[in-house]
């Protein structure tokens, strides 16, 4: 996403314990996504002194229930059955960190209205998309067949893809990291 926007970047996975962060967090989805994004960026920042590091994270909720990435195909199918006919909330956050200091954060949410999904559709969808969608919190990739899950989408396209890109670009411009 950053490269497509003309922002040079390198991907470096962060070594953080997301399970512990999620278990001990007591705020809303936006604050949890922000905490996870910041923890990831801070962990990578420790390995890259002087560099600006971007971290991001996304969470999916239906009502008060939070969904994590499915552990296997059966769990992915169960998630899709739960999402069927529901409005799901996708919260994405981004954090900008330098030398271990969180300099800027932003969180945004989108509402995705899942159409009624038949078991036949779910199976054929997973036949075509598994295991790739297993790495996605909502078991979909909007830029692929996942778009067929929805009747309507309310929210920013980039937030749905996993990062509130436009606010991030503004933060990068404000710090002179990309041309204004």
State where each predicted segment sits.
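Short glycine-rich, Thr/Ser-proximal phosphate-binding strand/loop in the N-terminal lobe
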Residues: 6-24, 102-109
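N-terminal G-site helix/loop of the GST-like fold
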Residues: 1-13, 174-178
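Anionic-ligand binding patches
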Residues: 24-180
């Amino acid at each position: 996403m950053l490269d497509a926007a003309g922002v040079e970047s390198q991907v470096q996975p962060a070594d953080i314990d997301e399970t512990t962060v999620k278990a001990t967090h007591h705020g809303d989805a936006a604050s949890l996504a922000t905490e996870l994004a910041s923890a990831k960026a801070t962990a990578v920042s420790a390995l890259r002194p002087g560099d600006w590091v971007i971290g991001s994270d996304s969470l999916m909720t239906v009502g008060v229930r939070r969904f994590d990435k499915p552990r296997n195909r059966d769990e992915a199918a169960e998630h899709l059955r739960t999402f069927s006919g529901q409005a799901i909330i996708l919260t994405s956050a981004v954090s900008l960190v330098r030398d271990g200091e969180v300099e800027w954060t932003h969180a945004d949410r989108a509402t995705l209205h899942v159409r009624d999904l038949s078991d036949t559709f779910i199976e054929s969808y997973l036949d075509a998309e598994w295991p790739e969608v297993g790495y996605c919190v909502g078991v979909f990739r909007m830029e692929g067949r996942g778009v067929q899950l929805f009747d309507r989408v309310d929210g920013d396209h980039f937030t749905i893809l996993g990062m509130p890109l436009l606010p991030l670009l503004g933060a990068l411009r404000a710090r002179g990291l990309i041309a204004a």
